[in-house]
């Protein structure tokens, strides 16, 4: 995720408007752009962030803003690279619950890269183990207990398998 200086005056509304509208952010932002940004943030339960400075957001709040931006317009496929990095445990659960809600509401396919294997087993319905090529594909419990998984991460398997 991008880093914003705590003293940076750019608000979430400024950031959203700069990314979604052809409107210079140094001019007053018309109500239609404000309403659009608020509606997008509402998808991720982030309406209260609209006027906050980007530099004052927590990791989880920043992920919400970036997710709202990625959902404008709502895609068929959402690709997220390490979306839980910089997010605390409570924020992780909120973000995963929200992704599950969005997946259902918008019939989204979500591709999520992570090294957080606990997340995989709770959130994913399919896991792809990659190491320059597909090593294993299947349900989380199958992939995470496979010899390919253990070999990839140089882990030892217990007696009788994983």
Label each region the model flagged.
Residues 17, 31-49:
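Conserved ABC ATPase "signature" region
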Residues 53-57:
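Conserved ABC ATPase signature
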Residues 74:
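Conserved catalytic motifs of ABC-family nucleotide-binding domains
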Residues 78-82:
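Catalytic Walker B motif of ABC-type/P-loop ATPase nucleotide-binding domains
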Residues 89-91:
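Helix N-cap at the start of a conserved alpha-helix in ABC-type nucleotide-binding domains
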Residues 114-115:
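H-loop/switch region of ABC-family ATPase nucleotide-binding domains
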Residues 133-156:
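Conserved beta-strand-loop-alpha-helix hinge in the C-terminal portion
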């Amino acid at each position: 995720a991008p880093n914003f200086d705590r003293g940076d005056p750019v608000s979430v509304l400024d950031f959203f408007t700069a990314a979604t509208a052809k409107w210079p952010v140094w001019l007053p932002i018309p109500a239609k752009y404000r309403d659009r940004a608020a509606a997008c943030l509402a998808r991720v339960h982030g309406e209260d962030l609209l006027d906050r400075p980007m530099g004052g957001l927590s990791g989880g709040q920043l992920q919400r803003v970036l997710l709202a931006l990625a959902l404008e317009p709502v895609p068929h496929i959402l690709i997220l690279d390490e979306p839980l990095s910089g997010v605390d445990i409570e924020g992780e659960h909120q973000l995963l619950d929200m992704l599950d809600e969005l997946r259902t509401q918008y019939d989204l396919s979500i591709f999520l890269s992570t090294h957080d294997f606990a997340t995989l087993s709770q959130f994913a319905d399919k896991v792809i183990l990659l190491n320059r090529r597909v090593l294993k594909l299947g349900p989380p419990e199958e992939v995470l207990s496979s010899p390919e998984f253990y070999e990839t991460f140089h882990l030892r398997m217990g007696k009788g398998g994983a």
